[in-house]
Design a protein with these regions (language model features):
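Alpha-helical, hydrophobic structural elements that either
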Residues: 1-250
Length: 250
């Protein structure tokens, strides 16, 4: 199996840190891309924020080293005591790719068909300045099937309400961590990221669409290249890892 071990733990004021390892005792299932797929949990009985990052992977020892950092939301000291850290999933064997998608320029639709997305299907949204996407919930209707990476498909591109929309489909995000983003590359090499993005479930609730909105004119777009950055694939390992650790204020 795969063994979890807490190497050290520290509690100082409003912050707790755990240094832990995951070691594959049977094979080579772990690698430098592995993570807990948001399944990790350490409960304090108070509201906390946290993150878990992979520090390194030792292929000779078949061991991944992680650092988990937690902080109280109100800045108050976290309580002392014995606490249980648990995780149910590991995602490994992911691959990263950077792909020229300029062929999409041949498919830009100036009058695309639009679909309305029900609020309950919208997963979330984002923008560099934190502003909500305009016309969120109105997305392009899929018309393309261009797959730049396994499990990822570009499904539509077109201008609507003054913005360029590019739509991508991630086939099964409930069992993989497939994700990515597109950018426009100007002739001078300047990279232009999406001004807004929003995400919505497919009809089955297992795959997800990503709609990226760019503030650019058709004439400006004609001079650009399109590039995609993707993380795809991966093997999901399920288990029930649990360890109890004492934490005292240092």
């Amino acid at each position: 199996g795969i063994r979890m071990e807490v190497v050290s733990a520290r509690l100082e004021g409003s912050t707790a840190q755990l240094y832990l390892t995951m070691q594959d005792l049977e094979g080579d299932r772990l690698d430098e891309s592995c993570d807990f797929f948001d399944s990790e949990d350490l409960r304090f009985g108070v509201n906390i924020t946290g993150s878990c990052m992979l520090l390194q992977y030792d292929p000779a020892a078949k061991t991944a080293h992680f650092l988990m950092t937690l902080s109280s939301q109100d800045g108050r000291p976290l309580p002392e005591g014995r606490f249980t850290f648990s995780a149910d999933e590991l995602l490994t064997q992911k691959s990263e790719s950077s792909i020229d998608l300029s062929e999409l320029l041949d498919y830009v639709n100036s009058s695309p068909t639009i679909q309305q997305i029900d609020d309950e299907h919208i997963r979330g949204w984002g923008s560099p300045d934190g502003s909500e996407p305009p016309d969120m919930g109105y997305a392009l209707t899929p018309t393309l099937s261009l797959s730049p990476a396994p499990g990822i498909t570009i499904t539509a591109i077109g201008f609507w309400n003054g913005l360029l929309h590019i739509q991508s489909y991630y086939e099964n995000i409930s069992k993989t961590d497939d994700h990515g983003f597109l950018s426009l590359i100007a002739p001078d090499g300047t990279e232009k990221a999406a001004s807004y993005s929003f995400y919505f479930w497919d009809a089955a609730g297992s795959g997800s669409y990503q709609e990226e909105l760019f503030d650019i004119s058709p004439d400006e777009l004609d001079e650009c290249a399109i590039r995609g950055q993707f993380v795809s694939g991966g093997t999901l390992i399920q288990g029930r890892w649990k360890v109890t650790v004492p934490l005292t204020q240092s």
